[in-house]
């Protein structure tokens, strides 16, 4: 039986790369999007082209009830997930004195509350299937060491790391591993306007990472062979920290 993996925020960038890699690994993929359904449909077509099944779940991870409704309906129809990749998130950067309450709440609620809103409806069905499972969250180098202009984002991602480690303790005897991948500077459409020369000078590898390199780490943690790896944070950042 082919196992199912849900990847949130999978219509572009890192999420797309992870969904495609996991499909090539042999998983059927649930693609989550908030609004860019046309882009998610394009990713679904790419997944079907490699012989795997793909379908789309559309909801806002910051809206608890709508997320629960969609996720519970999917489990009712298709059964519990083998794996979940919590990738979806947002950032609103700015110096701390200039951050508005909306800047703070929007980033913290979407990123940190999204952890609860996605995983809480899915964990109990994963336990009840009485089989191994995998949960991978996406944090950031900002959550590990902090970053100027990202106090809100750093706080949210540090919270995700803490929540990941705590959930791993709860699920360890259930054979469900819970790990975190923390990317550094990765080439996506979100980095196009950044001062790359200045940023690359701080990275020992002197280059940005590729989405496929982050996807490779997620692929490793999702594999059957990774069953003894849990409660870990894997950094993909060129040696930055």
Where do the PLM segments sit?
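Residue(s) in the substrate-gating loop at a strand-loop-helix junction
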Residues: 140
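Short, small/polar-rich loop/turn modules that mediate ligand/substrate recognition or access, typified
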Residues: 172, 177, 229-231
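Conserved glycine-rich Rossmann-like NAD(P)H-binding loop of the short-chain dehydrogenase/reductase
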Residues: 27-41
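Active-site helix of classical SDR
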Residues: 119, 156, 164
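Short C-terminal tail/terminal secondary-structure segment
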Residues: 145, 197, 201-202, 219, ...
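Conserved glycine-rich cofactor-binding loop
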Residues: 11-12
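Substrate-binding pocket helix/loop in short-chain dehydrogenase/reductase
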Residues: 95-96, 100-108, 199
